[in-house]
Each structure stands twice: as structure tokens, then as C-alpha cells.
Amino acid sequence: MMKSSELEKKKVLVLGTAKSGIAAATYLVKAGAVVTVNDGGTPSENDVQTLESLKVETLFGSHPLSLLDGTDLIVKNPGIPYQIPLLQKALELGIPVWTEVELAYRSTKADWVAITGSNGKTTTTTLVHELLKRGSKRVHLAGNIGFPAVEVAQQAEAGDVIVIELSSFQLMGIESFCPVSAAFLNLSPAHLDYHGDVTSYAAAKARIFSNMDEAGRLVVNADDEEVMRLSETAAAERLTFSRRQDAYAHIENDMIFVGQTEILPVRELALGGGHNLENVLAALTLIEPFGISLTAIQDVLRTFGGVAHRTEYIGEFAGRKVYNDSKATNNVATEAALSGFQSPIIWICGGLERGADLTPLKSAMTHVKHVIGLGETGQRFADLATEQQIASTVTREMEEAVATAFDVSKPGDIILLSPASASWDQYKTYEERGEHFIRSVQKVGGMMK
């Protein structure tokens, strides 16, 4: 743990505002650091007011290299790419560049449970949090689905547990971060515009276990060859999970096992879908050392229905069942969603163009009846449909896409938003996209008989 006094009078540049930047700046000011906050864009009015109250130096609209003069440390927003000249120069000068997670880790004596992977992070993290809440320790949820890590760390004490979902962006900026229990769920090409290539992306993910020793527990997917290969170098105890083969956590005659312990029949899980079964196996292996009672575990598994925007059932409108899977920002997540239905699917997809190969989606399109392309990649998805001899429509915005979905569907069909693309061409977050979808469904579907 880093003492606050170690930051006193240190010159720290906080790069980027939003939640994590504001939280980092607030902590650093309290620790006595000399803080400058820089954002290449225009921060929100609330962020500006907060920074004014902190009495820190600010510079918005650009990233001049002069900001590095005398700087001892940079704490960056995870989304800011390392390719910008300011960060390239900082690395050249040997200035440490952290994400807020590293700062948070150094500021508390609490234990950390961390989850990464291309898909399933949010569901697994939320489930782990729910399970650990049934134990004897105080548990905190941090990161993308909770409060900023450094904010949570200030509330956590020795003996507490912080559960955190970690992206490759966040893991790029760790130095000493070391969880007591970590999961590497799966790996598929994503964020290549940020990392440059699959190798760099995979290496960033693997950093989750880079500081772990034999006292730690690393949970990995036995069915993912690349995850298994990458984790061979881990010093931590490596335990596997699989829904297809023998592993430490596995399925046998419809029964979930962790080690030799029978947990629950699969049919009793509230959480549906094969991919979610993998998330359950990973979560159970992660929390095993914490001594949660079997009765408590079973109670959570029978009631935990998942998270918003992840194959979320919205309801039935005019005989059509509608699902919001806005969090599916890559092929693997969307493949899992498409494969989970047997009824005809009206598939709304598309978003930010990242140059991803859409070919792998073909095998999951068996039940797709109509493809509705949306956003920058909308036409590419329509072209994919044509290749599969499936009808398609390209639309400009969400309400038009939803109206089209109801027009081309009939009672008994599934309307599924599963974009296989990031949201940033039209929305700030996948949550904003999902909420717009839900409002559009309620508006359009509510007018139909």
C-alpha cells in the first residue's frame, strides 16, 4: 500500500476527466499532490465545477507536450490511446503512466477480486459481488459497473474485498496491481483500433495475473486455447472451468460441480444461456476460497437473472418477444445471443466501424429472419445478410430500426438488439444505446395491437 505522504508535493498529470479522472484528481488533491487535469475535449459542466472546487490547474482542448515539464506521474483515462504524442513522449522520458486502478490498488489494504475477458465480464463481476455479499466480509463493487476504483478504495478497509471488472484499457496502465483471485474468461479480437493488433490486445488482458504469486488463484476457461496458452506463464494457482469438458468447475449429468462439490442442477439457474453458464462456473471458482455457504450460493444462483443490456428481456409487444443486448460490442457476444434462440429472429445490429471481420457471425445466423443494419457498420451487416440469402434493411437511427423490426416481424418472432459493434458512432455508452432501444420499443410496440 502506498502512503498518502508518498504523493505529497508530487506533480501529477490527470489525463481525461469523466468519472475516473475526477475521482483520481479528488484523491490526489487530498493526498497533497500538485495536480493538473488535462482533457483533449470539453468536459461536462459538472466536471468543470468539481475541478474548480478542487482548485487544480486545468487545460482543455489539446494535449501540449509542455504539460510534461516536471511531471512525476500521469494517471490517464483508460480510453485515451497510448499513441497520442503526449503519452509517447512521457513513456520516452520514463514518466510512469497509470490508470486509476493502479492508484486505487496502492491506496488501500483491501483484497481485490478481478475479472477480465472479451465477453461475460459484467455478468461474472456482478454475480461474484452478489455471492460474496452473502459471506462475512464487507464487499465493494468497483469499476465500469460500480463507482470509480479509487473512490471505492477510500471506503474499503483491511479485510474488505473489492470486486472489479477490468478492461484491456485499464490493465495497460497497471504496475503493481495484484488481485488475490482473478478470472480470465475468454479472448476474441476486440479494440484493435486501440491496441493495434490481437497480440497486443491479448498481452494487455494477460496483465491481470502478471503480479500474482502462488498464493493467488487464477481462474481460466479450459475451452479457450489462447487463454490457456497465455496463462501457462502464471505463477498463481491456475484452476479451469468448462461446460464442455472435464475441469475444476464443470457440468456432470446436468449438475454444476466445483472441485468435488455439487452445487446446483443447471436447470435451477435463473441465468439462462450457455455463455452465462460459463460465467457461473467462473464466478463459483473465484469465490470458493471465501467460504460462502452452499445454501447461500444456491439461493443467489436461483434468483440472479443477469444484468441490464446483456440479453435483457424487455417484454412481449404485439406477440413479439424483445431482447436488449446492447452490451454485445463484438462478434463473440452477439454469436452467443443469436445462438440462444430457436424462434425466428429480427436482428438489429451495427454501430462504430472498427474493421472487424464479420464472417464468424454466419454460423450463428441460422434462425435470423431479417437483418436491420444501424450506424457506421449497418451496410456491412446488410451485405452479410445478403451473402446468407437473408432479407435486410439499412436504417439511420434506432427508432427507425425498431419500427422496421415490428413491420417485418410477426407474432412469435424475436426482436433482438445485439449490435456486435461499439456504440460510440451515435451514443456515448452502450447503456445509452440500450435505453434508447427500450424507449423506442415501448413507443412503437405500445401502439401496436
Curated annotation (Swiss-Prot):
Metabolic or biological pathway: Cell wall biogenesis; peptidoglycan biosynthesis
GO terms for MF: ATP binding; UDP-N-acetylmuramoylalanine-D-glutamate ligase activity
Classification via Pfam families: Mur_ligase_C, Mur_ligase_M, MurD-like_N
Subcellular location: Cytoplasm
Binding site for ATP: G117, S118, N119, G120, K121, T122, T123
GO cellular component: cytoplasm
Record keywords: ATP-binding, Cell cycle, Cell division, Cell shape, Cell wall biogenesis/degradation, Cytoplasm, Ligase, Nucleotide-binding, Peptidoglycan synthesis
GO biological process, alphabetically ordered: cell division; cell wall organization; peptidoglycan biosynthetic process; regulation of cell shape
EC id: 6.3.2.9
Superkingdom of the organism of origin: Bacteria
InterPro entries: Mur-like_cat_sf, Mur_ligase_C, Mur_ligase_C_dom_sf, Mur_ligase_cen, MurD
Gene3D superfamilies: Mur ligase, C-terminal domain, Mur-like, catalytic domain, NAD(P)-binding Rossmann-like Domain
Catalysed reactions, as listed in the record: UDP-N-acetyl-alpha-D-muramoyl-L-alanine + D-glutamate + ATP = UDP-N-acetyl-alpha-D-muramoyl-L-alanyl-D-glutamate + ADP + phosphate + H(+)
Purpose of the protein: Cell wall formation. Catalyzes the addition of glutamate to the nucleotide precursor UDP-N-acetylmuramoyl-L-alanine (UMA).
Family listed: Belongs to the MurCDEF family.
The protein, known as: UDP-N-acetylmuramoylalanine--D-glutamate ligase
Gene that this polypeptide is encoded by: murD
